[in-house]
Design a protein with these regions (language model features):
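Conserved SAM-binding loop and adjacent beta-strand
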Residues: 23-26, 43-64
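Alpha-helix initiation/capping motif
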Residues: 2-4, 48, 132, 136
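Generic secondary-structure boundary/loop-capping signal
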Residues: 14-16, 40-43, 49-50, 54, ...
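Residues at the start of alpha-helices and the adjacent loop-to-helix junctions
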Residues: 4, 30, 52, 77-78
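N-terminal auxiliary segments of SAM/dcSAM-dependent transferases
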Residues: 1-46
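Short linear sequence motifs
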Residues: 20-24, 50, 77, 103
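Conserved SAM/SAH cofactor-binding pocket of Class I
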Residues: 61-143
Length: 143
């Protein structure tokens, strides 16, 4: 299927981001996986392509407007749900080491498939609640 990515490209330009062809492909794959998995589990109420581009992908990247992302090396997405903003940030800023934390294992199964299908590295999923993860030595003061 041929997707019009104009909304995504224009939104990224506002944040000083220029997407390459691989990143565009990854966003399309992410969208397709999101819609496919959303049929069997509630990941998002927004499934229209243009709405996902704007309300999930572009909004996830809005942090880049106020931060110099080249100076950030690690981040955690607490309560990541369907992977927003963590996955879009990883696609656009591949140098980031990202942890996706969520209390529901079924959402992490979805995210692990997204990570694999998109060929992302330097990103991990962690099952648990924020207050519990903060007490574990492997997570405390690491991000």
């Amino acid at each position: 299927m041929n997707y019009d990515l104009t909304i995504l490209e224009e939104g990224c330009k506002e944040y000083g981001i220029q997407l390459n062809e691989e990143q565009k492909k990854q966003f399309v794959q992410y969208y397709e996986l999101l819609v496919e998995w959303n049929k069997v589990m509630n990941l998002t109420g927004i499934t229209d392509f243009k709405e996902v581009l704007l309300k999930h992908f572009v909004d996830s990247l809005s942090v880049a407007k106020g931060l110099d992302m080249t100076k950030i090396s690690t981040c955690i997405d607490v309560g990541t749900g369907a992977g927003f903003p963590g996955i879009p940030l990883k696609i656009v800023f591949p140098h980031l080491q990202i942890t996706l934390l969520d209390a529901l294992n079924k959402r992490l199964n979805f995210l692990n498939e997204v990570i694999e299908k998109l060929g992302l590295s330097g990103i991990q999923t962690v099952h648990g609640r924020a207050e519990d993860a903060a007490r574990k030595a492997e997570h405390r003061e690491k991000i």
